[in-house]
């Protein structure tokens, strides 16, 4: 059950970051500046990388807690 909770909370984090990224992109497109759009894409890459790491840690933590019976 812990794994399911971890994954569902990760989905919420992911959706929140997507909303923030979309807001970032909409601001950059309104400026019509290619540099701003590229900067936003770099930030998106960093966010997705962090999300992958957090996702992996949450799954490992879920497996450890379920195996120890906590």
Curated annotation (Swiss-Prot):
Belongs to the UPF0519 family. This is UPF0519 protein D. The lineage of its organism: Eukaryota, Amoebozoa, Evosea, Eumycetozoa, Dictyostelia.
